[in-house]
Amino acid sequence: SYVITTPKMWVMPYGCGEQNMVNFAPNIFIME
């Protein structure tokens, strides 16, 4: 479940959630 909460943590402070999601998405899938 931490994979679902983690994106919110770095999406809010960075502000550019869309760009970060594209860069972090591959890493999130690897963590699974």
Curated annotation (Swiss-Prot):
SUPFAM superfamilies: Terpenoid cyclases/Protein prenyltransferases (SSF48239). There is a cross-link at residues 16-19 (Isoglutamyl cysteine thioester (Cys-Gln)). The keyword Kinase does not apply. GO terms for molecular function: serine-type endopeptidase inhibitor activity. Keywords: Bait region, Disulfide bond, Protease inhibitor, Secreted, Serine protease inhibitor, Thioester bond. It holds the Pfam family TED_complement. InterPro entries: Alpha-macroglob_thiol-ester_cl, Alpha-macroglobulin_TED, MacrogloblnA2_CS, Terpenoid_cyclase/PrenylTrfase. The keyword Disulfide bond applies. Gene3D superfamilies: 1.50.10.20. One of its GO terms (cellular component) is extracellular space. It is found in: Secreted. Is able to inhibit all four classes of proteinases by a unique 'trapping' mechanism. This protein has a peptide stretch, called the 'bait region' which contains specific cleavage sites for different proteinases. When a proteinase cleaves the bait region, a conformational change is induced in the protein which traps the proteinase. The entrapped enzyme remains active against low molecular weight substrates (activity against high molecular weight substrates is greatly reduced). Belongs to the protease inhibitor I39 (alpha-2-macroglobulin) family. Homodimer; disulfide-linked. This is Alpha-2-macroglobulin homolog.
